[in-house]
Every structure is written in structure tokens, then in C-alpha cells.
């Protein structure tokens, strides 16, 4: 499948166009995209769009890109964040092409001189292209800039939230906590479970049920356990039982749980 995606297509230029929606301003098909970058994000998005009926052209980021926006309705820069600005600067601007990046923490300024700019950050983990392409269908996306980014979300059956430029970094920090920090906490679960002689798999259903409760009730109402009950004697025993290297994270998260419990109690009293 990746080999098929890797074949360079004309992105709607010099080919017999398939049936599709038409942009009234440019009279071009809006179901074609060129993606610069063959990492997990670029290949996942390319595969997902191709399966939704789009024509997709994948380009390596080290390839000549000056003409990348020529004859292309949507140009996606799917490179690592630190090089997005330099790649965008190397592309000649085209008023008929929308240039988009996939970075969560960067604003539209990273796309420099291009007249039509947008950002499209998928709120989903993309471990590899096959799984990633499936997860993109129906996913949440943080968007900003040109309305054309909404057409990508629509094509994937996703949902979008517009994030203002001044809030991009805070938004991305929340995404990191939700995904990366959660994984780090589960790494601690695995270590402590091993110390107790219990397989990590035994805790996975608990994690799933907890996430389901948060989704249904919200974090405050979903909190259970010793902190929610005010049972600080049990918390102290936990800290005594843990290896020294595990205590700091446990203590920090117990304090965060205390804040959550206090907020939930205040809300219940109001």
C-alpha cells in the first residue's frame, strides 16, 4: 500500500479528473493533495485520504520542493516541526494552493509567505501508517486558517475544533499530557506491578474503564480511590511501599488528585 502511495501522481494536473466537488473560486477539484514528508503522520494522512477517494502525491522532504505547490489544490507539509518553516520557505507560493502543516504547537507564521495557509493537527496517536490511517477516520482535528482544512476533516468523517493562534502551545501541551504523559504514567504502573509480581495486563481493563468513566462523567466525578475518599493514611502507606524512584511521581499525582477532589466537592456543595 505504501508503494502505491509512493508513486508520484499529478495532483489533479495533466490527468483526466474524476468526479468530485468543485471549488467555485478556482474551478479545481478539491479531492487531491500533495504531502511533503514520508514520516508516520504524512503517510498515515496520505493513506487515509487515498482511501476516501482523494488523489495523493507523496514527496520526500529532501526532494526539490520549489514547485511543490504548482498545480496542487492542497499542499501538506508533514515534516518534523523544526524544519516546517524552512520547507515552507523553499516552496514557491501559489495563490491557488492552500499550504497546510500538521504541527500542534506551531501557528500559521511557520508557513511564511504563502497567501493561503492552514494548520491541521490530528488529535490521535499515529504509531505507523496502516493503523494511523484508520485512526484518522472520525478523529478530532485542531484547525486554523484557510477554510479548505475543513474539507480534509470532512473527507475523513472527522470533527474539528478551531484553536486561536495564541492558544496553540497550550492546546498542544494538553495533547501531550493526554497522550505522552499518560503513557509515562502507565510505564510507572508496569514497573510497580512488576515489583508486586502482578502482570501489567491485569491493569489494562482498569485503565479502559477509567477512561470511559472520564468520558461519561468528567474528571472530577470519575475520580475514585483513597484521595477521593480523603484516606491519606492509605496514601502514606503506598509511599512507604514504593521504591524511592517511584515516590515523586506518585506524590505529585496524589496532589493533583487532591485538587480534583476538592473541586468536585465544591461543585457538589454549590
Task: Outline where the language-model segments fall.
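NAD(P)+-binding Rossmann beta1-loop-alpha1 motif at the extreme N-terminus of oxidoreductases
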Residues: 2, 8-70
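Hydrophobic anchor at the start of a short beta-strand
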Residues: 33, 55-57, 117, 160, ...
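Hydrophobic Val/Ile/Leu positions in short beta-strands of Rossmann-like dinucleotide-binding domains
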Residues: 33-35, 77, 143
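Rossmann-like NAD(P)(H) cofactor-binding subdomain of soluble oxidoreductases
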Residues: 43-47, 62-132
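Internal alpha-helical scaffold of NAD(P)-dependent oxidoreductase catalytic cores
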Residues: 45-47, 52, 129-216
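Structural signal for conserved beta-strand scaffold positions within catalytic alpha/beta enzyme cores
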Residues: 58, 101, 118-119, 142-143, ...
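NAD(P)-dependent Rossmann-like dehydrogenase/reductase catalytic/cofactor-binding core
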Residues: 201-270
Amino acid at each position: 500500500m505504501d508503494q502505491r502511495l509512493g508513486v508520484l501522481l499529478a495532483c489533479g494536473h495533466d490527468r483526466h479528473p474524476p468526479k468530485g466537488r468543485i471549488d467555485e473560486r478556482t474551478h479545481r477539484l478539491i479531492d487531491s493533495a500533495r504531502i511533503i514528508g514520508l514520516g508516520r503522520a504524512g503517510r498515515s494522512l496520505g493513506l487515509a485520504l487515498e482511501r476516501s477517494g482523494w488523489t495523493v502525491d507523496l514527496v520526500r522532504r529532501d526532494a526539490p520542493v520549489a514547485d511543490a505547490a504548482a498545480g496542487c489544490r492542497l499542499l501538506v507539509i508533514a515534516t518534523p516541526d523544526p524544519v516546517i518553516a524552512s520547507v515552507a520557505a523553499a516552496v514557491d507560493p501559489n495563490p491557488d494552493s492552500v499550504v497546510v502543516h500538521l504541527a500542534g504547537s506551531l501557528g500559521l507564521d511557520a508557513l511564511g509567505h504563502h497567501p493561503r495557509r492552514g494548520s491541521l493537527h490530528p488529535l490521535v496517536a499515529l504509531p505507523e501508517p496502516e493503523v494511523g490511517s484508520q485512526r484518522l477516520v472520525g478523529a478530532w482535528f485542531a484547525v486554523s486558517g484557510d477554510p479548505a482544512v475543513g474539507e480534509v476533516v470532512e473527507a475523513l468523517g472527522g470533527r474539528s475544533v478551531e484553536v486561536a493562534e495564541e492558544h496553540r502551545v497550550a492546546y498542544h501541551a494538553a495533547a501531550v499530557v493526554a497522550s505522552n504523559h499518560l503513557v509515562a504514567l502507565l510505564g510507572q504502573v508496569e514497573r510497580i506491578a512488576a515489583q508486586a509480581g502482578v502482570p501489567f495486563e491485569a491493569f489494562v481493563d482498569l485503565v479502559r474503564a477509567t477512561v470511559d468513566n472520564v468520558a461519561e462523567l468528567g474528571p472530577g466525578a470519575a475520580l475514585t480511590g483513597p484521595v477521593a475518599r480523603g484516606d491519606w493514611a492509605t496514601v502514606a502507606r503506598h509511599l512507604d511501599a514504593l521504591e524511592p524512584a517511584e515516590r515523586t511521581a506518585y506524590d505529585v499525582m496524589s496532589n493533583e488528585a487532591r485538587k480534583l477532589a476538592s473541586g468536585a466537592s465544591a461543585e457538589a456543595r454549590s
